[in-house]
Design a protein with these regions (language model features):
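C-terminal motif of bacterial Sec signal peptides marking the signal peptidase cleavage site
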Residues: 16-19
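Bacterial signal peptide processing site
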Residues: 21-24
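Short active-site neighborhood of thiol/selenol oxidoreductases, capturing the structured segment around
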Residues: 193-196, 203, 212-233
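Contiguous segments within soluble domain cores/interaction surfaces
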Residues: 26-197
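Typically the conserved alpha-helix immediately C-terminal to a functionally engaged Cys/Sec
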Residues: 234-251
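Bacterial N-terminal signal peptides that target proteins for export
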Residues: 1-10
């Protein structure tokens, strides 16, 4: 089993997706005109498990790199145009258009109305749009963004859309998984939350109080996040886990909030069974995370986000579900 890693890990900042592994990665970033101070400007598709059918969250990240390091494009909006390439042998067919809105990692700066290059320590995130794909095969996204003092830039990246999702998706029934909880015995605390290393306590025990199976039996809405805050190759998993904790504190009576750690034993590459049930594997045979799933009281998945989610948008969707 592979863990899909973003191209940004090559640059030292896997900021967009903990997913992809070498030459069989379906997403292909393409360098574009230069960025600030002549740096190389690139875009990457952060989403995975894209399939034909209903509109789904599509996420891209844009970064500039030079000998001094990496900066990320943050804030504001950009326009996206999609083209269907099929197997790549024919003429590209124009597809949907969309506007991508910036979503920052939880706890980082969300400010700024215009796209701006930022230090990843200050702001990091993606641009999200809801897009529907009508055919399986290779697609291309062309993103155009107006950057103050830099002008208009257009970047392209290709990605694969499959006939069906490989992972649980909206409309599917949630799997009645017996994930580890604070009451689990015979397991190290780090298997419950990877931050509980070297005697450290589980930092968010309230997110580990029940199993997905028990929560489904309660017939209540569920928000379950699959992430590994310590071993994630991106800088997104920890903030997203904190974001779920914040939602749990703000809406304690609206849903059951669950965090599932990816690794049972990271050093031996042993994945927790619950994580294996839900996020392994995509069409490339890779485990992908982080993923947040919203499950209705009827046990059906209503929405999912990966790798990033907007807590305000999640809260709005949660509020629409019956208690």
């Amino acid at each position: 089993m592979r863990v899909r890693r973003s191209i940004l890990t090559i640059l030292g900042f896997a900021l967009l997706a903990s997913a992809c592994s070498g030459s069989d990665d379906p997403a292909s970033p393409t360098a574009a005109p230069t960025g600030p101070s002549g740096s190389s400007l690139s875009m990457e598709v952060a989403s995975s498990d894209l399939a034909v059918g209903a509109a789904q969250h599509f996420e891209v990240g844009i970064f500039s790199s030079d000998g001094q390091g990496v900066e990320l494009l943050s804030f504001g909006q950009l326009s996206m145009g999609f083209s269907y390439l099929g197997d790549g042998s024919g003429t590209a067919r124009p597809g949907p258009q969309a506007v991508g809105t910036y979503v920052g990692a939880y706890g980082t700066s969300q400010g700024g109305s215009e796209p701006t290059f930022t230090d990843p320590n200050d702001a990091r995130g993606i641009y999200l749009a809801d897009v529907m794909f009508d055919q399986a095969g290779t697609w291309q996204v062309d993103a155009t963004v107006d950057i103050p003092d830099e002008g208009s830039r257009t970047l392209s990246a290709s990605f694969v859309v499959t006939k069906e999702h490989s992972l649980p998706a909206p409309g599917d029934r949630a799997k009645p998984t017996e994930n580890l909880t604070m009451d689990s015995t015979g397991v190290p605390p780090a298997a419950i939350d990877s931050r509980a290393l070297d005697g450290a306590p589980v930092p968010d025990p309230d997110l580990h109080g029940t199993t997905i199976a028990d929560a489904l039996d309660q017939q209540r809405p569920i928000l379950v996040l699959f992430s590994t805050p310590t071993y994630c190759v991106s800088l997104m998993c920890g903030p997203e886990t904190d974001g779920l904790e914040a939602l749990a504190n703000q809406y304690p009576d609206r849903a059951v909030f669950i965090h599932v750690e990816i690794w049972r034993n990271y050093q031996k590459s042993v994945v927790n069974r619950a994580a294996n049930d839900w996020v392994c594997c995509d069409a490339t045979g890779s485990l992908t995370e982080p993923w947040l799933f919203l499950i209705g009281p009827d046990g059906v998945i209503k929405d999912r986000w990966g790798p990033l989610f907007d807590p305000d948008e999640v809260a709005k969707e949660l509020a629409q579900l019956p208690r």
